[in-house]
Regions:
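Glycine-rich hexapeptide-repeat left-handed beta-helix
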Residues: 1-11, 45, 53, 59-62, ...
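A positional/architectural concept
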Residues: 7, 12-67
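Short proline/glycine- and basic residue-enriched helix-capping loop/turn segments at helix->loop/beta transitions
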Residues: 79
């Protein structure tokens, strides 16, 4: 569902893809070519969420914020894996947040980094550019290779293609551009 909250209406680029079982709430901006998948929640009810271009928020991921302290900003070409949680943090471009990873308030993740599946970033953790981290709490394991950086880009490209395929072959599961425009117009006029 696409939901307004306290007169804040999501801003969704016409080329973004939102699945009908996902929730996008309040002061959220979803960039060009990005996708929010089945069961994912982008809940910007008490602060802002900004999602860049060509980013995918996979099934059952949760993106949230902290009142007045920590908005969430997610860069371009980011892959947020299934069941991941990002709360009040800043994620650079071309990052992988692995399945089930938890990123808590005030974290900053540099571009071209990989957060391993089920890792936990405690509040205020800063991850430099181009590293792989894992664990609870996370520790830097090594630098990311050039091949892995290309793989991060490929992951974002793949999810953009998958979303387009759903729009073509499973139209009932995903909002069309017309659907999104009508919903936003109705929310704005309420």
């Amino acid at each position: 569902m696409i939901i307004n909250y306290l007169d804040k209406v999501p801003k969704i680029d016409p080329e973004a893809k939102i699945f009908k079982t996902a929730d996008v709430i309040g002061d959220a901006v979803i960039g060009k070519g990005s996708s929010v998948w089945f069961g994912a929640v982008v809940r910007s009810d008490v602060n802002t969420i900004r999602i860049g271009e060509d980013t995918n928020i996979q099934d059952n991921a949760t993106i949230h914020v902290t009142t007045a302290l920590y908005p969430t900003t997610i860069g371009n070409g980011v892959t947020v894996g299934h069941n991941a949680v990002i709360h009040g943090s800043t994620i650079g471009d071309n990052v992988l947040i692995g399945m089930g990873a938890v990123v808590l308030d005030g974290c900053r993740i540099g571009k071209n980094s990989i957060i391993a599946a089920n890792s936990v970033l405690l509040g205020g953790t800063e991850i430099t550019e181009g590293v792989l981290v894992a664990g609870n709490p996370v520790k830097i394991k090594r630098e990311v290779t050039a091949e892995e950086i290309e793989g991060l880009k490929k992951s974002a490209e793949n999810y953009a293609r998958y979303a387009r395929n759903y729009l073509t072959y499973s139209k009932d599961s995903i909002y069309s551009q017309t659907d999104i425009s009508m919903i936003i117009e109705n929310l704005t006029s309420c």
